[in-house]
């Protein structure tokens, strides 16, 4: 965790909350469903950043993996499944699309430069395996993992079966709709 002052923390909190509010309003008010889905992903990412401000690293990672990586992608796929051919048109690129493309390219170049210029051989505060084994399970990630694989294993597996049944049901419904059309 990078130590930041209380005023910086408060400022980041206010900025993230404002971004969440604007994104949530966009989700509700925009007429195109795909834009709403993309703004929903933006809101999920902002919530993950709030978790990082609260020193809940595992929750931030879970937020990104589960909500942005799974739920939002599922919504986008559902939109693609039910969209009509009228929605997809070959039209000239708008100014927003051009700005988005340049922003993406700039971010890609910036991240690539950061990856190659970062010194990856510095090891800060790495503990040996014996030190880790002697420590009690005190971190959030270790505690959550311990409880998920011991006390909560049966409900965890039931949840995975429920998700599997929902996935099979969605595939069945989608295939029946394509057959009738």
UniProtKB/Swiss-Prot annotation:
Q: What class of enzyme is it?
A: translocase
Cell compartment(s), UniProt: Plastid, Chloroplast thylakoid membrane
Q: Where are the transmembrane segments?
A: 10-30, 33-53, 62-82, 98-118, 153-173
The alphabetized UniProt keywords are:
Chloroplast, Membrane, NAD, NADP, Plastid, Plastoquinone, Quinone, Thylakoid, Translocase, Transmembrane, Transmembrane helix, Transport
| Chemical reaction(s) catalysed | a plastoquinone + NADH + (n+1) H(+)(in) = a plastoquinol + NAD(+) + n H(+)(out); a plastoquinone + NADPH + (n+1) H(+)(in) = a plastoquinol + NADP(+) + n H(+)(out)
Q: Which GO terms describe its cellular component?
A: chloroplast thylakoid membrane
Entry EC no(s): 7.1.1.-
Task: Provide the topology term for how it sits in the membrane.
Answer: Multi-pass membrane protein
Write out the GO MF terms.
NADH dehydrogenase (ubiquinone) activity; quinone binding
Give the main location: plastid
What family name appears in the similarity comment? Answer: Belongs to the complex I subunit 6 family.
Q: How does it assemble?
A: NDH is composed of at least 16 different subunits, 5 of which are encoded in the nucleus.
Function summary: NDH shuttles electrons from NAD(P)H:plastoquinone, via FMN and iron-sulfur (Fe-S) centers, to quinones in the photosynthetic chain and possibly in a chloroplast respiratory chain. The immediate electron acceptor for the enzyme in this species is believed to be plastoquinone. Couples the redox reaction to proton translocation, and thus conserves the redox energy in a proton gradient.
Provide the protein name: NAD(P)H-quinone oxidoreductase subunit 6, chloroplastic
Source organism per entry reads Zygnema circumcarinatum (Green alga)
Write the lineage as a comma-separated list.
Eukaryota, Viridiplantae, Streptophyta, Zygnematophyceae, Zygnematophycidae
